[in-house]
Amino acid sequence: MLKLSEPQAKEYIAELAAKCDRRWKETVDKTRFMDELRAGKLKKETLQLFYKNWGSFVPVINSVYTSAFYRHLWFFVKNVDLMEVYTQKVLDEFGHPCPPGHIQILMSTGKALGLSKEEVLLSPMLPECRALPDFHRTLINDGQIQEYWFSVLWEHPFGESCLDFFKALTMHYGLSTADASYFSKHHEADTMDHLDRKSHGAVTQTVLVRLLQQGIIERPGYSAEYCAVTPADLNKMFMDGCYNATH
């Protein structure tokens, strides 16, 4: 069992978060998809295919987060104070700017990219894209409690990439700031405290600190580092799949 003091847990998580950020920079940030997006040279067809797959991913990952309360109910009942930070993210995802939440801006940015609501939400995912939500579903359903929470540390580097998306869409692809709001809002939500709530990344780290204080047992093959950095590889595969399918 790995059991740490609060300062030790915070240091451990900071190190893992830094590894996650580095892996993201080494993988996602160096894809042809992101290079061409930042330069305004990514084909619109590729961008649309990415967004259709991303639109199918979003409801899944949000539902996985809400299911965490049921799957990990024993932990939240034992640590009632953490229900507040957990609920902050639920309110953000499903209540801002009003119910049903972020899915509204997901659809509005999709519309600005020339996609219908059905294309954004109901498109079959490419196998290379399907791997990302299936990884999270596997951890929430089959894994130890900490595995899921370590696996969402990638929200912070994703939030930084959202700024790249926002800049590219408004500078090179003719979208207004309102049109591209899915990415600006997620840059804000994932990387900084906002609306008197913790950033999504801070919510995750708060839960992980408590888990490490109370002790975790790792399954063979599912170390904290593996769970934390693998989503960067899967996001790269997601982008590569969309790029290769349109070239």
Predicted segments with their positions:
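Short, charged, low-complexity loops and linkers
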Residues: L2-I13, R38-Y51, N141-Q146, S181-K185
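Short alpha-helical hairpin
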Residues: L2-K3, E15-E45, I61-Y65, A131, ...
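Acidic, carboxylate-rich catalytic segments that either coordinate divalent cations
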Residues: K3-L4, H200, T204, V209-H247
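Active-site-proximal alpha-helical scaffolds that flank and shape metal-associated catalytic sites
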Residues: Y12-E15, K19-R22, E84-E188, D233-M237, ...
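Alpha-helical bundle segments that constitute or directly flank the non-heme di-iron/ferroxidase center
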Residues: R22-E26, K41-F75, Q146-F165, A232-M239
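Short, contiguous, pocket-lining structural segments
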Residues: T46-L49, N53-V60, K78-V85, C98-H102, ...
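Structural helix-adjacent loops and short alpha-helical linkers that scaffold large soluble proteins
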Residues: L73-V77, K117, T177, I217-Y222
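Glycine/small-residue-rich hydrophobic helix-like segments
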Residues: Y182-L208
